């Protein structure tokens, strides 16, 4: 007996594949049209894949982005890396940030539940990310600022504004530090930490399940608004340079190895401690711009991310760095 007697019709395989992939018909509709069961339709479609009658192609740059993300995940031991494609139509100076922010918003809403406590940091990428949250997907989670306010930046980018907007978009309760993030002395920080509102929030930090932050770059060139907007004095900045600063996250400054810079800014800052931050189960970093590559690498070496969301140009630069 010829073995071919057990083979399905090639025509039927092609027809089922055509109806399914080209015409978008359901397996039930195809079964009715071809006079076979849904199970047979499923097998015909599988045969079309096995015999390479149908071929799946992921177009560039999407395939390259997927492969780059996989490499970054392996190199830095990340739970997930998402590389956002930059749309080529209607390009603007914020296209990279917006692409990263949109992916960040969708990722956050994919994982957040009403049992979560979400810590939020300041920044322009965070501004767009929260802007893109879908208010139809309300979670009733808890939202908390990861640090104090920054008087020298745009009101819309401040952590207090962003945390309030996130709570309004997704539903839930917000907890905020209402004082400035950088204070004049360590004594003022100690006094604030004794106040009930501040003490309650600092205690809440140990219960945060998800954090959402960007990073700022201070190497090879300082582009972070914490430097360019006079957040700190020139003397403070020079101390950071002498401490080999590479970047900032949640008002904390870190070096090439992701360790916090040892200057008096550390004790004058009202923000979650880096050690406490690193214990958060899901740390999401959303970063855009190739100028942040060195700072981002330092943050990843310092284990500051579980999930990384970046634009395709920054991803390519990160892969090229040793």
Model regions and ranges:
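Generic hydrophobic alpha-helical segments
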Residues: 16, 100-108, 129, 201, ...
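Conserved phosphate- and dinucleotide-binding cores of soluble alpha/beta proteins
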Residues: 4-11, 15-17, 22-29, 35, ...
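Structural signal for conserved beta-strand scaffold positions within catalytic alpha/beta enzyme cores
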Residues: 82-85, 145, 176-178, 285
């Amino acid at each position: 007996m010829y073995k071919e007697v057990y083979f399905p019709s090639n025509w039927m395989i092609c027809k089922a594949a055509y109806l399914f992939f080209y015409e978008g018909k359901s397996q039930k509709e195809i079964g009715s049209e071809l006079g076979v069961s849904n199970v047979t339709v499923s097998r015909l479609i599988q045969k079309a894949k096995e015999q390479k009658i149908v071929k799946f192609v992921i177009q560039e740059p999407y395939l390259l982005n997927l492969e780059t993300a996989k490499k970054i995940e392996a190199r830095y031991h990340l739970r997930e890396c998402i590389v956002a494609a930059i749309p080529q139509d209607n390009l603007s100076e914020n296209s990279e940030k917006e692409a990263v922010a949109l992916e960040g918003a969708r990722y956050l809403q994919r994982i957040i539940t009403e049992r979560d406590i979400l810590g939020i940091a300041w920044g322009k990428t965070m501004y767009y990310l929260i802007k893109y949250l879908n208010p139809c997907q309300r979670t009733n989670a808890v939202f908390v600022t990861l640090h104090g306010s920054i008087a020298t930046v745009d009101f819309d980018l401040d952590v207090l504004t962003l945390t309030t907007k996130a709570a309004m978009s997704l539903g839930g309760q917000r907890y905020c530090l209402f004082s400035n993030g950088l204070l004049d002395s360590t004594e003022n920080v100690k006094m604030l930490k004794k106040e009930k509102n501040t003490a309650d929030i600092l205690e809440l930090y140990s219960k945060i399940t998800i954090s959402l932050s960007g990073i700022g770059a201070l190497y090879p060139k300082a582009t972070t608004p914490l430097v360019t907007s006079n957040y700190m004095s020139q003397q403070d900045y020079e101390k950071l340079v002498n401490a080999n600063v590479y970047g900032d996250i949640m008002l904390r400054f870190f070096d090439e190895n992701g360790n916090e810079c040892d200057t008096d800014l550390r004790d004058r800052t009202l923000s979650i401690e880096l050690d406490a931050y690193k214990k958060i189960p899901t740390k999401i970093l959303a970063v855009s711009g190739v100028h942040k590559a060195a700072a981002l690498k330092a943050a990843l070496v310092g284990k500051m991310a579980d999930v990384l969301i970046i634009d395709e140009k920054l991803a390519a630069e990160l892969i090229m760095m040793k």
